[in-house]
Each structure stands twice: as structure tokens, then as C-alpha cells.
């Protein structure tokens, strides 16, 4: 759990940086369009849509913008050619990387993703080369650890698979199928999460103890997330305490 918490801190910091770049709106709109297209326009019955709508609202996207994106999805406008494609590869130090994209032009996306790996001494692999190292699961996080007992009671009753508690975070883990039900149960109990999403979680970790390698891994993640077609980047990296302190400096 400590590794999750440390990496989460970096993710949260990066999320703020990404928002300042102004690209997060485009990525959320694409996700809303696709989620609505695949699962319908009602967030109450579409957990994927509900999760991204909550994220969009958290970065001050207007309801009008969100609703227009939902209508684009269910109406099939402008997104018929948008495809979800996942790329796999390795960064330095044997770090496994999954890159989820939404693209209307594979001839643009593939070279862009490959360039990010090659510029940071990594390698873009073939389908299946690292996917087996990750498991799809729901993650619902709370920063208020004083709510541990109540969260545990509600989440487990609603079908959560596991709950991990650190000194600064509670992580509720669900299957992708029960994610929405557990999220609803927690919300109904007055427990507002700080983040909720279905992710690809690594089953093993690649620890990086060298600061130069750590910087290359972070550069790879930054470069990938800067690509317009990239929606999510998942890795199995775990930085040592010493490296993390230097990255945070």
C-alpha cells in the first residue's frame, strides 16, 4: 500500500500539471463520448460514464459541455471512427507500461507512441507483451482515514473485494463489474470518495532505485500523456524512498 500511496502522490501532482496544460478537457470529452456510446447516456446505469463525469466536474468542466459530449456519444456524431487501442511496452529498468488511447488515425498514433519509448530508452512491444502483468479493477480512494470502519462496513457489504489502509489513504478495491454498485453504496452512506475509477493495476512492481532511470520513466510518462490521443498511462513502477525524495525536491 505504501507504494500505491507514494505513486498516488505523484499522480495527484501530475494531474494538477496536466490540468494547467489545458489538455485534460479534450481527454475527458473523448472519454465521455466513448463511455456514452458504449454504455448509454445515464450515468446512474453507466459506471464508466459516471466516473469520468465526476472527474470532468472536478476540473470545472460545465454541465453543458458534459451533456453535449454525452449527446455526441449516444447520437453517434463525430465519433464513429474513434477507436480504443492499447499499446504495451517497457521503459528503462524493466518498467512495464500500458498506454490506453482513443484515436481516429492509427497511422498518427503508433509513430507518436513509439517515439516516446525510443526517446527515453524504452521499447514499444507487441500486444500481450506486458498486459498479463496488470489486472483490471475498480479503485475508490478516500483521504480521510478516520472513516475506515464505516467505509469498510459499507464497501464490503456492497461487494468490494478488498480494502487497503495506509497512514494517509483508504483504498477500496472492486471488480470492474461491481465498481458502480460499491460506489453507489458508499455515496448513499454519505461517504464521498476523493477519486473513483476503473484502472489497470500492476500485479508485480519494478522498483527503481536510480534517480537517472527514475527521471527517464517520468519523462516517458509525461511524453505519453502529452499526446492528444492518449487517455491513460499505467505502469508497474515503484520508486525507492530515496528516489522519490529527489523527484519531489
UniProtKB/Swiss-Prot annotation:
Gene3D superfamilies membership: 1.10.10.200, 3.30.70.980
Record bears the keyword Ribosomal protein: no
Main location (coarse class): cytoplasm
UniProt keyword annotations, A-Z: Cytoplasm, DNA-binding, Transcription, Transcription regulation
Similarity-based family: Belongs to the TACO1 family.
Highest taxon in the source lineage: Bacteria
Keyword Cytoplasm: yes
Pfam family, one: Transcrip_reg
GO molecular function term, any single one: DNA binding
One GO BP annotation of this record: regulation of DNA-templated transcription
Name of the protein in its database record: Probable transcriptional regulatory protein ABAYE2155
Subcellular location: Cytoplasm
GO cellular component: cytosol
SUPFAM superfamilies, A to Z: YebC-like
InterPro entries per record: Integrase-like_N, TACO1_YebC-like_2nd/3rd_dom, TACO1_YebC_N, Transcrip_reg_TACO1-like, Transcrip_reg_TACO1-like_dom3, YebC-like
Disulphide linkage map: none
Species of provenance: Acinetobacter baumannii (strain AYE)
Amino acid at each position: 500500500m505504501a507504494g500505491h500511496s507514494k505513486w498516488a502522490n505523484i499522480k495527484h501532482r501530475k494531474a494538477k500539471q496536466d490540468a494547467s496544460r489545458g489538455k485534460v478537457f479534450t481527454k475527458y470529452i473523448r472519454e465521455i463520448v466513448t463511455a456514452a456510446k458504449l454504455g448509454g447516456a445515464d450515468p446512474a446505469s453507466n459506471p464508466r460514464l459516471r466516473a469520468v463525469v465526476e472527474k470532468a466536474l472536478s476540473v470545472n468542466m460545465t454541465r453543458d459541455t458534459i451533456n453535449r459530449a454525452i449527446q455526441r456519444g449516444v447520437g453517434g456524431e463525430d465519433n464513429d471512427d474513434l477507436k480504443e487501442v492499447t499499446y504495451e511496452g517497457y521503459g528503462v529498468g524493466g518498467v512495464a507500461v500500458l498506454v490506453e488511447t482513443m484515436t481516429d488515425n492509427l497511422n498518427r498514433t503508433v509513430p507518436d507512441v513509439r517515439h516516446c519509448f525510443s526517446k527515453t530508452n524504452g521499447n514499444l512491444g507487441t500486444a500481450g507483451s506486458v498486459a498479463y502483468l496488470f489486472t483490471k479493477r475498480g479503485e475508490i480512494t478516500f483521504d480521510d482515514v478516520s472513516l475506515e470502519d464505516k467505509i469498510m462496513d459499507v464497501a464490503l457489504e456492497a461487494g468490494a473485494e478488498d480494502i487497503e489502509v495506509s497512514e494517509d489513504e483508504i483504498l477500496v478495491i472492486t471488480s470492474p463489474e461491481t465498481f458502480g454498485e460499491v460506489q453507489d453504496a458508499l455515496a448513499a452512506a454519505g461517504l464521498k470518495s476523493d477519486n473513483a475509477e476503473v484502472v489497470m493495476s500492476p500485479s508485480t512492481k519494478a522498483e527503481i532505485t536510480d534517480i537517472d532511470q527514475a527521471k527517464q520513466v517520468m519523462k516517458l510518462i509525461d511524453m505519453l500523456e502529452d499526446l492528444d490521443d492518449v487517455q491513460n498511462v499505467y505502469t508497474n513502477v515503484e520508486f525507492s524512498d530515496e528516489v522519490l525524495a529527489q523527484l519531489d525536491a
